From Swiss-Prot:
One of its GO terms (biological process) is cell adhesion. This is Serine-aspartate repeat-containing protein C. Homodimerizes; via N2-Domain. Interacts with host NRXN1; this interaction mediates bacterial attachment to host cells. Residues 496-606, 607-717 form the CNA-B domain.
Length: 955
């Protein structure tokens, strides 16, 4: 294969050892990937921050957040992305603010105008909010920061989810995925470090305590850390229970929908706030099925519950139960009610649905007597709805009914609305009431409540102006509202629609829904608006159906998650949008009707296999031969493209191995070399018959691959022992006995010539050639024993007796020639060529012992009376030549550490095979032997001369 990589392995030789395959098991671990996410308790984007001011001018808070220009408030998410951290258990996250859509500021102006027509003056008096005795005061009232929620140090680890397809009921076209019924898991959501803190706060110098000034931009913040047990599932619930004097939100009432978001705007849990019980119940989404180890901390904006915490400068017990954890803290509350003011108003609350302003005005708290009282309301950017009958006038009969929180118990007030004529003008933007109602004078006190609805035609955020025109002074109070990025208003109830449909298994992969194809349960579906903000999420039911409800006209985005083990089918196949697949992400438009055409199809991802064979390559040719067998128990490891181990196995008794359930992609196969074996040659022939090496890279593309093989052969052992023993024994014994007796009376001429020639030549030649070339195990023992024994015994006995009276001529010639030739030649050549390791020790011992013994005994007796001439010539030549030649050549080529002895030995020894025992002599004693022989001959010659002389004398 082109994707294979040849790897060179080490070689080694271990002689005479049993090769064993050492197999180790390998376990695959699952790494948990830590994903840091930031969770936020949001207030569903329907709440506004509001500030109330009494100085007649608009003060814009720098801490206010932005809002889109739509009816509903939109929560903004910090654009910081989550940072994954695979090294630590948690990941630090940036603070994320879930802001409500509009930051509203209310500005109130109080102006007194004297009735003197000749000097009409307008004065504005301001004083510190802590001052209660000024007739005209500037106040800073409520700032709604209900959605200013920050999350810190939140982490979550993704879960692995397996989704199985279920049978689809194709008849249930309009059925909706039923919400999963979970259990209360207050005991599985754990809170710690709970605190209720005053954001900003105002220090009372008299008491030294920090107070919560509800109408001066202060808010309360509920803070806590939390962890969620991994056993929590989609549909499980937990609760936030607020106490008697404490609630979520701010001037704007908390929305019924209070969702829990992470930093990217994904919904973790959907909350429903019940104002009756002052409790929020959160239901977990499928987010908790996708992630483990979810933990974090949060801050949630909260407010004093005005209807219960009614009195300024009073400490109230702010209590909350988060899950099963309870916390309380006493907070001093001040609303800034100035009882000396003839006209003062406040925003009682802002409705979280239609953003209407529910106003409360206190008229004549000082109980002054007037002969003229005209109450006028002018709206800018708002309108009254006369048909709603929500302009109420209550007569105060008890001074205590002017509660500081501007939330009087109207059930205890006297409703006198019908006694007055309310005149609407200026397109319902102005309302006028004559509070004298025909009386000449009056000191009556009133509480007037109104509802102002946003005017969609307004280009600004509007304001509400009040005037109380009396016979003494004209008082004015103005309430203005502004947001940072535009108004978010609504007028009337819009019709809601549904969006969704179906996720199915496209078994034939044609991208179309067929009658026999079933739905897939458990697919995550996310709904987003046109700006990419997540609005909702759900999970397909057992029939593959899903549905989002309560949607207005507009453009939406739907995202489908890919179920485990599936692949998205072809998108937009054919022309029928109702039966095709719209892909993983699609856009749906709602235009005065439900849109139930957003489908997605998936087919089961094909799985492939990989593997083949590990064999014993006995002939080391790198090819699989029919006679070669597989190797059992070889460990094979499979890695993915990232180098992560995804499987291990061992070859079976036939050398086969296999990995299954693999996706198309890049892999690496690693063979663990068995102990005692050597990697054979790689890529020597066709891909399905060769060896691919110890590590092989392979790419699977829509097919199986059974060509990944590897071969090994056993390491060789060579034992070569060459022993050459050459024994040459040469024994040369030359015995010459010459007896010459000459008796001459007159003239005797005796010539005795004794020539003894002993020549011993011992040549021992032993040629042992041992050549061992073995690939596996060769034991060659070459033993050459050459024994050459030469025993030459020459015995010459010459007896010459001459008796002559006159002339005797005796000639004795003795010639003894002993020739012994022993040739011993030892040539040991040991040549070992091995792939392993051969250590050849060549020891050549050549011992040549030649013993040549020449014994010449000459007895000459000469008796001559007259003249004797004796010439005795004895020539004895003993030549011993012993040549021993031992040549040992050992050639060893090896890579490993094993030893092979080779001992050629050539030995030449002296052995005697005659009965006579001669002294042991070496070749270096030849000169000594010759001297002895010549000495004997000279002695014989002397005897003859003496004998001849004596005969002459006798003569």
């Amino acid at each position: 294969m082109n994707n294979k990589k040849t790897v060179t392995n080490r070689k080694g030789m271990i002689p005479n050892r049993l090769n064993k395959f050492s197999i180790r098991k390998y376990s695959v671990g699952t790494a948990s990937i830590l994903v840091g996410t930031t969770l936020i308790f949001g207030l569903s984007g329907h709440e506004a921050k509001a500030a109330e001011h009494t100085n007649g001018e608009l003060n814009q808070s720098k801490n206010e957040t932005t809002a889109p220009s739509e009816n509903k408030t939109t929560e903004k998410v910090d654009s910081h992305q989550l940072k994954d951290n695979t090294q630590t258990a948690t990941a630090d996250q940036p603070k994320v603010t879930m802001s409500d859509s509009a930051t509203f500021k209310e500005t109130s102006s109080n102006m007194q105008s004297p009735q003197n027509a000749t000097a009409s003056q307008s004065t504005t008096q301001t004083s510190n909010v802590t001052t209660n005795d000024k007739s005209s005061t500037t106040y800073s009232n409520e700032t709604d920061k209900s959605n200013l929620t920050q999350a810190k140090d939140v982490s979550a680890t993704p879960k692995t989810t397996t989704i199985k397809p279920r049978t689809l009921n194709r008849m249930a076209v309009n059925t909706v995925a039923a919400p999963q019924q979970g259990t209360n898991v207050n005991d599985k959501v754990h809170f710690s470090n709970i605190d209720i803190a005053i954001d900003k706060g105002h220090l009372n110098k008299d008491t030294g305590k920090t107070e919560f000034w509800a109408t001066s931009s202060d808010v309360l913040k509920l803070k806590a850390n939390y962890t969620i047990d991994d056993s929590v599932k989609e549909g499980d619930t937990f609760t936030f229970k607020y106490g008697q004097y404490f609630r979520p939100g701010s001037v704007r009432l908390p929305s019924q929908t209070q969702n829990l978001y992470n930093a990217q705007g994904n919904i973790i849990a959907k909350g429903i706030y019940d104002s009756t019980t002052n409790t929020t119940t959160y239901t977990f989404t499928n987010y908790v099925d996708q992630y483990t180890n979810v933990s974090g901390s949060f801050e949630q904006v909260a407010f004093a519950k005005r209807e219960n915490a009614t009195t300024d400068k009073t400490a109230y017990k702010m209590e909350v139960s988060l899950g099963n954890d309870t916390y309380s803290e006493e907070i001093i509350v001040d609303y800034g009610n100035k009882k000396a003011q003839p006209l003062i108003s406040s925003t009682n609350y802002i409705n979280n649905e239609d953003l209407s302003r529910n106003m409360t005005a206190y008229v004549n708290q000082p109980k002054n007597t007037y002969t003229k009282q005209t109450f006028v309301t002018n709206l800018t950017g708002y309108k009254f709805n006369p048909n709603a009958k929500n302009f109420k006038i209550y007569e105060v009969t008890d001074q205590n009914q002017f509660v500081d929180s501007f939330t009087p118990d109207t059930s205890k007030l006297k409703d006198v609305t019908n006694q007055f004529n309310i005149t609407y003008s200026n397109d319902n933007k102005t309302a006028t009431v004559d509070l004298m109602n025909g009386q000449t004078s009056s000191n009556k006190q009133y509480i007037i409540q109104q509802v102002a609805y946003p005017d969609n035609t307004s280009t600004d955020n509007g304001k509400i102006d009040y005037t109380l025109d009396t016979d003494k002074t004209k008082y004015s109070w103005s309430n203005s509202y502004s947001n940072v990025n535009g108004s978010s208003t609504a007028n009337g109830d819009q019709k809601k629609y549904n969006l969704g449909d179906y996720v199915w298994e496209d078994t034939n992969k044609d991208g179309k829904q067929d009658a026999n194809e079933k739905g897939i349960k458990g697919v995550y579906v996310i709904l987003k608006d046109s700006n990419g903000k997540e609005l909702d999420r759900t999970t397909t039911d057992e029939n593959g159906k899903y549905q989002f409800t309560g949607l207005s006209n507009g453009t939406y985005s739907v995202e489908f998650s890919t179920p485990a083990g599936y692949t998205p089918t072809t998108a937009n196949a054919g022309t029928d949008d109702a039966v095709d697949s719209d892909g993983l992400t699609t856009t749906g438009v709602i235009k005065d009707a439900d849109n139930m055409t957003l489908d997605s199809g998936f087919y089961k991802t094909p799985k492939y296999s990989l593997g083949d064979y590990v064999w014993y390559d006995s002939n080391k040719d790198g090819k699989q031969d029919s006679t070669e067998k597989g190797i059992k128990g070889v460990k094979v490891t499979l890695q993915n493209e990232k180098g992560e181990v995804i499987g291990t196995t061992e070859t079976d008794e036939n050398g086969k191995y296999r990995f299954d359930n693999l996706d198309s992609g890049k892999y690496k196969v690693i063979f663990e070399k068995p102990a005692g074996l050597t990697q054979t040659g790689t890529n020597t022939t066709e891909d399905d018959k060769d060896a691919d090496g110890g590590e092989v890279d392979v790419t699977i593309t829509d097919h199986d691959d059974f060509t990944l093989d590897n071969g090994y052969y056993e390491e060789e052992t060579s034992d070569s022992d060459s022993d050459s023993d050459s024994d040459s024994d040469s024994d040369s014994d030359s015995d010459s006995d010459s007896d010459s007796d000459s008796d001459s009376d007159s003239d005797s001429d005796s010539d005795s010539d004794s020539d003894s020639d002993s020549d011993s030549d011992s040549d021992s030649d032993s040629d042992s050639d041992s050549d061992s070339d073995s690939d596996s195990d060769s034991d060659s023992d070459s033993d050459s024993d050459s024994d050459s024994d030469s025993d030459s015994d020459s015995d010459s006995d010459s007896d010459s007796d001459s008796d002559s009276d006159s002339d005797s001529d005796s000639d004795s010639d003795s010639d003894s020639d002993s020739d012994s030739d022993s040739d011993s030649d030892s040539d040991s050549d040991s040549d070992t060529d091995s792939d392993s390791d051969s250590d050849s020790d060549s020891d050549s011992d050549s011992d040549s012992d030649s013993d040549s013994d020449s014994d010449s005994d000459s007895d000459s007796d000469s008796d001559s009376d007259s003249d004797s001439d004796s010439d005795s010539d004895s020539d004895s030549d003993s030549d011993s030549d012993s040549e021993s030649d031992a040549d040992s050549d050992t050639d060893s080529d090896s890579d490993a550490g094993k030893h092979t002895p080779a001992k050629p030995m050539s030995t030449v020894k002296d052995q005697h095979k005659t009965a006579k025992a001669l002294p042991e002599t070496g070749s270096e004693n030849n000169n000594s032997n010759n001297g002895t022989l010549f000495g004997g001959l000279f002695a014989a010659l002397g005897s003859l001369l003496l004998f001849g002389r004596r005969k002459k004398q006798n003569k």
